[in-house]
Amino acid sequence: MNKIKALLIISLALLLVWLPAQGTDINEYLSKEYPGQVVSVKVTKNKVKIKGIRPSGKGYYLSEVTPWEALDAQGLQDNLIRLCFKKFRRSVPRKIETGGIVYDRSLSRWAIVKADGEDVPVLCSHARYADEVAPVRVATEMPLTGKKGLGGYRLNKFADDIEKMDIRSVTINIHLNSLLYASEKPGSFLREYGGVKYWFDSTKVDYLDRVLSYCSDRGVITSAITLIDLKSADPELTPVFRHPDCDGGFYSMPNMTNPLSFNAYAAVLDFLADRYSSGEHGRINNWIIHNEVDYGIDWTNMGKQPYEAYMDAYEKSMRLNYNIARLYDQQTWTLGSYTHNWTVGENENGFPVRKMLEDHVRYSNAEGDFRWGVAQHPYPQDLNDPLFWIHDTGTTWSKDTKYLTFKNLEVIDEWIRRPEHFYKGETKRLLFLSENGTNSPSYSEEDLVNQAAGACWAWKKLSALPGIDGVQWHAWMDNRGEFGLKIGLRRFPDDEEAPGAEKPSWHVWQAAGTDKEDEVFAPYLKVIGLGDWSEIFHEVTD
């Protein structure tokens, strides 16, 4: 029996005690003012150094909360360190053996609890993540030099579109649990993480090398969309990666409920962050964590959960990704992925995007800030209908608009530029429109023209809004797997009449941001019913 199989048995047993509600009332926790405070957590090469102020009296301890633990009685009573002085400084080894793995404690949270004389430990501070970590590498700066991008980029016969259109950013999907195996397979190579051996697929890694190098060699910023497939490439790893409450959908929330699952997820993130930060194999500049989590029942599934439990799981996943990525690239951003449902849920299974964003701010205020940003998907209300400027009736310029689409991008621009939403109160967070496009219901001339008109509107608006850092038009080309939509800039690659042919929207996107923009865009003013592009802009109202 190999180590992963043995640990899997232990981990499955631990799942029996995992509760979705996770003990602590998250909303109360984020809002509460505690009597104690963990002031800072600094991680050196070999030590974790924690400073704080505990309440007066006796019986207080420093509690380490690992990523697979909750802020409940079980999570808070492990790894207690007595605090003798009101103002304290404690130093602990960075690496320990626990749960069958060699664990890097730079990934933990640290909280003050009162344990003596209590039936269960009582939380007396917010739990704080590491503020500073000694880097493994300092990546070379790679600036974003323009707003125009493509979504779902890959290497094919049209790969040079990024040069033809002067593309400055792309997204690529990375199916994390398709990359590695629990035991050696033909064409795999070994990498150890946390004392556990994993074997990575050489063919899949070679493709990532080639596509990421192609982009970085041309100065193109790449954001990796991290996805957990419902089934792993190695069946043995399916229950390791897949969340125990996942009951369907297209992708799963990662399983971080036990040491083995945490370690496997961290192992693949560490591999990618390490390999694609040096520049030798290309770069991953930013990370988009999972897909459209406000409608997770379809796109990042962990079953039907209370909002607080789902949000807490997603926050942990974002934190883990960032805390690993920053070891190798301190300029990286970790972006949350959201639909156009600004203040409404998709249905009873969906959550409002603005609420999730504001709760990310609350987590940062409570547990220490990190470089998180927003990957917004401002599709039209009806993804099939390109005429969003007419038919998006639930889309207004109010801060409380139901939907956020190309029509009213001013709303999220205003939100991201508020100082209270800045990273550490100083730096505007990165905002990408990372998946969005207008549809051509058919390849008729009228439908293609309407699609192109929508692309003109989108570019004119976003290029003028300073809070929006970039857009990745999705899809680059029409895709048979997208529910009949034709939102690409090119036709289906297997189209019978003109396979992969450029649509009018392709030429709009090529002209965007160039000296040909006004000439190419001008005919579409009449299509939309405008006299001038300035008419599309509106003030945001309360």
Predicted features by range, described:
Residues 280, 310-445:
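Noncatalytic carbohydrate-binding groove/subsite architecture in carbohydrate-active enzymes
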Residues 104-121:
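Short, aromatic- and glycine-rich surface loops/edge beta-strands on solvent-exposed regions
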Residues 124-176:
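Boundary/entry segment of secreted carbohydrate-active catalytic domains
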Residues 298, 443-542:
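Aromatic-rich peripheral "rim/lid" segments of glycoside hydrolase catalytic domains that contact
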Residues 43-56:
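Aromatic/hydrophobic beta-strand junction motif of beta-rich domains
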Residues 168-345, 381-382, 478-483:
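Substrate-binding cleft and catalytic face of glycoside hydrolase catalytic domains
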Residues 152-164, 269-275, 353-361, 452-460:
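Short, acidic/polar
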Residues 23-43, 514:
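Short, compositionally biased P/S/T/A/G/V-rich stretches that sit at domain boundaries
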